[in-house]
Amino acid sequence: MVLLTGNGPSDKNGKWAFCTGGDQRIRGRAGYQYAEGETSDTVDKAKLGRLHILECQRLIRFMPKIVICLVNGWAAGGGHSLHVVSDLTIASAEHGRFKQTDADVGSFDGGFGSAYLARQVGQKFAREIFFLGDEYSAEDAHRMGMVNRVVPHAELEAEALEWGRKINGKSPTAQRMLKYSFNLIDDGLVGQQLFAGEATRLAYMTDEAAEGRDQFLEKREPDWSPFPWYY
């Protein structure tokens, strides 16, 4: 299980932020350039043209562990999409704020950040969130359906740890299969591949699979008689 949250409060203004998205000061025509001190002559071209937030989304979506977002402050732009793609979201009642700023800066999340958001809150609310770019409280987000629980700020970490205790107290194989089952309907063939890979791994644990391997290595006919068909 993974708990994902932000540092805070800010040394500059005392405010809290979960994640405020991509730094527009280092956004170029080909993506974001994170290497410090680079110039157009020294920059590694292979590092350009990347939107790192998409890699974060894929990691969260495809890892077998359950990811809980602790929204302790602003979740804006790409940060908003991060909480959307996570498995569960717990938000601070006092400081949790949600705002989709993509259209304000000439950007748009045409993947999980928008389409999966619509799965959570419905098409009308999702379009409102993106088209208007308004600010929403933690209670607003909970009412819409994109936040699981709203708790006092001081209890945010304790609540997440309690959720983690419950999650880790259950079958790890069942939990990972559940995550991939939930994802499968939205993830197309990639989702099917992830689910099928886990199913294959489970099959490899059986005596039946061991017999299939052994008969091949031993160059003999297989004996499937101990393994009846289940109906």
PLM feature spans:
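Glycine-rich phosphate-binding loop at the start of an alpha helix
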Residues: 50, 54, 77, 111, ...
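C-terminal long alpha-helix characteristic of the crotonase
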Residues: 13, 91-96, 147-194, 207, ...
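Glycine- (often His-adjacent) and acidic-residue-rich active-site loop
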Residues: 6-56, 106
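CoA-thioester-processing core
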Residues: 55-62, 70, 76-130, 144, ...
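Well-ordered beta-strand positions
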Residues: 88, 128, 132-134, 140, ...
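Helix-loop "lid/cap" segments that line or gate small-molecule binding pockets
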Residues: 129, 181, 185, 198-204
